[in-house]
């Protein structure tokens, strides 16, 4: 067996991020051949990934990337098994690399990411193979759970990520004054993250949701002994409160609870002589 130098072990560690003892073993197993040692570690990572495939990966982080011109944005959820790994530089750096690659290539789903190749820092492997390698490096199941992309040619994309990186949102505003709308867009992203709306406008609340809520409100009123002739009025009132919870434009504004989001948009438009509206949003909460 050839002599394995400390420098070779360090070089392999720098190339792969794997622990020193594992790097030494890989070099010993491959007769000191650096490329074969890298392949050995990749195979070991793939084997561990297969072994841990059935494990639950419920920890992790949300990562967001926005283009320099604020016309594209990506949000991802990358999972692992423990909070300890989720907070580590290797894991957070990996999430950032995936989000950067998705933004650069305009990828809109986790599935479409798998064949794309990450950079030299990840051995120019595909995302799919890099996930296996990272599983071997960190000793936990790693999973790219979901990914969403927003793009606009008529407005601005903005984001908010809550401290701890377990909650985040990206939003698209249609506006003829994107630069002036940047702060407003960030506020709306914070609103989405904090208040968890399900739609922008009440007109697109799914009909089945409305009927389900109305039936719940109706049964609640009857079980409380409300006179039947007043039940429909009660249902209507409670439905309005429901809209204020789930419809973004009807929610109390997070920075001023006396104003609604719709009113904030209208006031901004009036003051700035701008056309502005919320087109869509994506909100991710870890595990939700």
UniProtKB/Swiss-Prot annotation:
Pfam family, one: EF_TS
Superkingdom of the source species: Bacteria
GO molecular function, one term: translation elongation factor activity
Region (Involved in Mg(2+) ion dislocation from EF-Tu): 82-85
Location relative to the cell: Cytoplasm
Listed GO CC annotations: cytoplasm
Xref: InterPro entries: EF-Ts_dimer_sf, Transl_elong_EFTs/EF1B, Transl_elong_EFTs/EF1B_dimer, Transl_elong_Ts_CS, UBA-like_sf
Keyword entries, A-Z: Cytoplasm, Elongation factor, Protein biosynthesis
Signal peptide location: none
NCBIfam families named among the record's database cross-references: tsf (TIGR00116)
Function: Associates with the EF-Tu.GDP complex and induces the exchange of GDP to GTP. It remains bound to the aminoacyl-tRNA.EF-Tu.GTP complex up to the GTP hydrolysis stage on the ribosome.
The family this protein is said to belong to: Belongs to the EF-Ts family.
Name used for this protein in its record: Elongation factor Ts
Origin species: Prosthecochloris aestuarii (strain DSM 271 / SK 413)
Gene (UniProt): tsf
């Amino acid at each position: 067996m050839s002599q394995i130098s400390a420098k070779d072990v360090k070089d392999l560690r720098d190339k792969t991020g794997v622990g020193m003892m594992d790097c030494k073993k890989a070099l010993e197993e491959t007769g000191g051949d650096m490329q074969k040692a890298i392949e050995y570690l990749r195979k070991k990572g793939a084997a561990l990934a297969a072994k841990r495939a059935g494990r639950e990966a419920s920890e992790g982080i949300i990562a967001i990337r926005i283009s320099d011109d604020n016309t594209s944005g990506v949000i991802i959820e990358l999972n692992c098994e423990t909070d300890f790994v989720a907070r580590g530089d290797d894991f957070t750096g990996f999430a950032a690399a995936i989000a950067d690659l998705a933004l650069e290539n305009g990828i809109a789903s986790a599935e479409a990411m798998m064949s794309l190749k990450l950079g030299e820092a990840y051995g120019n492997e595909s995302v799919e193979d890099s996930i296996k390698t990272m599983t071997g490096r960190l000793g936990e199941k790693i999973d790219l759970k979901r990914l969403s992309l927003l793009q606009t040619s008529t407005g601005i994309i903005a984001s908010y990520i809550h401290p701890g990186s377990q909650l985040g949102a990206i939003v698209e505003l249609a506006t003829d004054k994107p630069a002036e709308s940047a702060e407003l867009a960030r506020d709306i992203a914070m609103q989405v993250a904090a208040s968890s709306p399900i739609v922008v406008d009440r007109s697109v609340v799914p009909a089945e949701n409305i009927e389900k809520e109305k039936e719940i409100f109706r049964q609640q009123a009857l079980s409380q002994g409300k006179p039947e002739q007043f039940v429909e009025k009660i249902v209507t009132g409670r439905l309005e409160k429901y809209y204020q919870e789930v419809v973004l434009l009807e929610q109390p504004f997070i920075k001023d609870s006396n104003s609604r989001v719709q009113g904030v948009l209208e006031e901004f438009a009036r003051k700035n002589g701008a056309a502005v509206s919320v087109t869509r949003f994506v909100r991710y909460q870890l595990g939700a």
